[in-house]
């Protein structure tokens, strides 16, 4: 049996300021740091093997704080496109670049080193015309019902921005290709990311309908823990888990 832990980042400066953060790189607040450390304490009994996060600092900071409690040092894994000499040949004679995953230094040189995979597929929603704007001002301009629809529905997002369906299309293939095989190898994985990229993963893992996903909200820095056994992921304490709020 192995574990999959998904964690939304701790409170950020723009959570406090009431702004749509999206892809804007906003760090944690003092409260967010404390939340991440409390999350780490909840995970002390699970020895982490591999980590995944987005390209945004608030998710990365949350991950670093969790790893610090386990006395582990994260080593970023970088994907590099191959050079001309590194290309592989397809059956039809065409060529494609081979991507290699490289560490700044070997990850197995010390027992406390742990790989960190950082990818835009796990980024928060790109909010389009709402990006960086004050939530109360946008509700006054477009109406609270419209804002809720853009932010909660599966198929429709804010103008010039992403819907949850768009996020699902980038996050779920990444999960299936990069994360699921590691769970199959019996390793414990943590994913530190964002409200909407994690909602997309929860929808996929738990088979939640397009309508019911509207009701799912994630608390800051509260772990959602799945056990993986027999090819299936099952959430622990699914009915009482305070990390996942089933309301608007």
Swiss-Prot record:
Enzyme class, spelled out: isomerase
Reaction(s) this enzyme catalyzes, per UniProt: (2R)-2-phosphoglycerate = (2R)-3-phosphoglycerate
Binding site for substrate: 8-15, 58, 124-127, 135
Site (Transition state stabilizer): 194
UniProt entry keywords in alphabetical sequence: Gluconeogenesis, Glycolysis, Isomerase
Pfam families associated with the record: His_Phos_1
PROSITE patterns in UniProt: PG_MUTASE
Entry's family note: Belongs to the phosphoglycerate mutase family. BPG-dependent PGAM subfamily.
PANTHER family: PHOSPHOGLYCERATE MUTASE (PTHR11931)
Name of the protein this chain belongs to: 2,3-bisphosphoglycerate-dependent phosphoglycerate mutase
